[in-house]
């Protein structure tokens, strides 16, 4: 919720742009909160591409990521990419000199990218920054036969992976959002179940610490399922298979771009049950994707009008 208070003197002398001064800023602030909450979901995304520390600023950077989408059975239409302002500026500079009708004009005049390399590209200040765990050692899978079934993993789409070989000291080695591959564990197309030729990337869902002997159990996604309708990989990892961290160097922060399938996230909103009466007036408006309630009341002591803007999502 957001709240604003408007004094009687302001309403009388200087308050002639109600929509511009109150409604639009409050709606924008609510939209930014939603955008930030969506960006904060990034640790659950297990596909990963690119070189940490090198912003994606080429056609190939986006197109290669799109190839991973296609190999993974995702739809070609409706793909979206969300970049930091710095990355968006680099893409705009890349295409402003081209002769694609419309896109180059937007890139030149407004530093906007639009549809490019198979994605609808957007600029956001909420592009997340990921800080890699402290890592350390030579992490290995500890024990074979760690595949799971769909029945055991379907509710969380995750599993525990037992590893060792970390530096022999208790420490928080992996952070939520760290991504890694396992030697000889390849992704499969979900429809054909044929290997894509790409090592499956796994994300860590919660911070994981090693013990004094260098053992660590991580909660990862996707689960390692080697057969059936929901197969995720071509084979389960062998004992002592090596883990390779893809998200960057120890304890280093990197800005991320988020590339999404149109069905990646469901935004669900519904009206709040707000009681009326006792001087409180509430108006609820439902838009295409969200619902906002605006409640107002007057402070009898100060004559200030208080307005509260609420959204549930």
Give the residues covered by each predicted segment.
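Second-shell loop/turn segments in exported
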Residues: 9-16
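Core alpha/beta structural scaffold of self-assembling particle/tube/pore-forming proteins
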Residues: 16-313
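Acidic/histidine-rich, surface-exposed loop or edge segments in extracytoplasmic proteins
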Residues: 4
């Amino acid at each position: 919720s957001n709240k604003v208070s408007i004094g009687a003197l302001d309403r009388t002398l200087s308050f002639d742009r109600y929509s511009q001064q109150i409604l639009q800023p409050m709606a924008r602030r609510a939209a930014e909160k939603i955008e930030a909450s969506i960006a904060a979901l990034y640790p659950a995304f297990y596909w990963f591409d690119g070189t940490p520390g090198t912003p994606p600023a080429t056609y190939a950077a986006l197109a290669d990521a799109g190839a991973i989408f296609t190999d993974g059975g995702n739809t070609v239409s409706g793909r979206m990419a969300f970049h930091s302002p710095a990355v968006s500026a680099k893409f705009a500079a890349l295409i402003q000199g081209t002769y694609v009708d419309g896109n180059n004009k937007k890139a030149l005049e407004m530093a906007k990218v639009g549809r490019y390399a198979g994605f609808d590209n957007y600029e956001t200040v909420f592009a997340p920054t990921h800080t890699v765990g402290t890592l350390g050692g030579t992490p290995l899978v500890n024990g074979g036969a760690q595949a799971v079934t769909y029945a055991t993993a379907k509710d969380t789409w995750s599993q525990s992976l037992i590893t060792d070989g970390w530096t022999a000291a208790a420490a928080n080695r992996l952070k939520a959002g760290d991504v890694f591959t396992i030697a000889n564990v390849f992704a499969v197309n979900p429809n054909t179940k044929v290997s894509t030729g790409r090592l499956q990337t796994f994300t860590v869902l919660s911070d994981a610490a090693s013990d004094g002997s260098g053992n660590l159990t991580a909660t990862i996604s996707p689960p390692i399922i080697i057969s059936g309708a929901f197969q995720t990989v071509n084979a389960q990892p062998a004992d002592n298979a090596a883990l390779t961290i893809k998200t960057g160097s120890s304890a280093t922060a990197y800005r991320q771009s988020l590339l999404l399938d149109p069905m990646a996230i469901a935004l669900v909103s519904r009206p709040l049950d707000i009681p009326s009466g006792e001087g409180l007036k509430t108006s609820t408006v439902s838009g295409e994707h969200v619902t906002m309630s605006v409640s107002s009341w007057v402070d009898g002591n100060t004559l200030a009008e208080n307005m509260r803007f609420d959204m549930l999502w």
